[in-house]
Amino acid sequence: MKKAYYGDFGGQFLPESAMFALNELEGAFLKFSKDKLFKKELNELLKTYVGRPTPLYFARNLSKKYQHEIYLKREDLNHTGAHKINNAIAQALLAKKMGKKKIIAETGAGQHGLATATAAALLGLECEIYMGATDVQRQALNVYKMELLGAKIHAVQSGLKTLKEATTAAIQAWVGDIKNIFYVVGSAVGPYPYPKMVMHFQSIIGKECKMQLQKLNKKVDYIIAAVGGGSNAAGIFYDFIKDENVKLIGIEAGGLGIDTPYHAATLNKGKTGIIHGMKTKVLQDDLGNILPVHSVSAGLDYPGIGPLHAFLFESKRAQYHAISDEECMQALKLLCKEEGIIAAIESSHALAFLEKLCPTLKKKSVIVVNLSGRGDKDMQMIRDYKKGVIYG
């Protein structure tokens, strides 16, 4: 595997002016990811500030319903409410070690923006967040939290006003002041070394999960995670990739149906192309124009995918399925009623696949679902969905 690629996917497709910053970032990442003092400081923050390790919870009522052993990796219990803080606090700490004073980030559901603003406040860094205007509207609570933490919010008005446009705006701002700004990428996407770096910082999810299963003397058969850009899935998948006995399943946003134009099922419906500095699978037309996407989830409506997932899809090491808005919302309500847990809409896509997977299994299986975030941020969206309001 070439340094910057996963199979045919990855690379660095940005202007020459960005190469200095990417090389500088790669050097700093390779240095500090092996530095004992950096690792000690980061691990202490993850333990005492973020709240790791997160539990691997046996969902007894779901297990009874589906007649399989269902476990939830509780990333929703992290400080700020999702897996995003694992990566954001690590990159912010790296930025500080590099002498940067200002960090910026893109965000869709607001969880990465919130995590980045939180890390910036803790570490004394200036912070600006780029967010599509549509997402600013549907994730108003997270916007207010970010502002309360001292971050400046840029509501991006171009295109569909969602995650793709926010990412484009953040890249433009970064390239415009590349010596002073550190861009905290929120998912396992973008030009190298970002996909590798984000996966490295999120891999703590899978490492913990593997140790927790060993303590329970359980062998996992299936791991299910929602996929937008792909950081939570990459985080829980990575330590299991070499174990062919473990089936890895990523769940994309099926929106109103993958046979309609209203979805974000990049691997199921996309083609190989270039987006945001990487070669990957992209939802695009025959002329290479990026197609509009839709999902009830602000965190999954992205027309690209991290290069690791494109590689796992092409190599058939992982399966990728789509779950519709309606299936997702039914799963969200089911978890509330069965386990007393309000999951994020993103995570509920992964939960919904249990309804499809479990009836097909011939033997009792151990299934882990990565519960990537909690649903506090989604209360208005859930109410609006019931009223028939459609965003994106």
From Swiss-Prot:
Xref: InterPro entries: Trp_synth_b_CS (IPR006653), Trp_synth_beta (IPR006654), Trp_synth_beta/beta-like (IPR023026), TrpB-like_PALP (IPR001926), TrpB-like_PALP_sf (IPR036052)
Cellular compartments per GO CC: cytoplasm
UniProt-listed Enzyme Commission number(s): 4.2.1.20
Matches recorded under Gene3D superfamilies: 3.40.50.1100
Family per record: Belongs to the TrpB family.
Assembly and interaction partners: Tetramer of two alpha and two beta chains.
Protein name from the UniProt record: Tryptophan synthase beta chain
Organism name: Campylobacter jejuni subsp. jejuni serotype O:2 (strain ATCC 700819 / NCTC 11168)
Phylogenetic classification of the source organism: Bacteria, Pseudomonadati, Campylobacterota, Epsilonproteobacteria, Campylobacterales
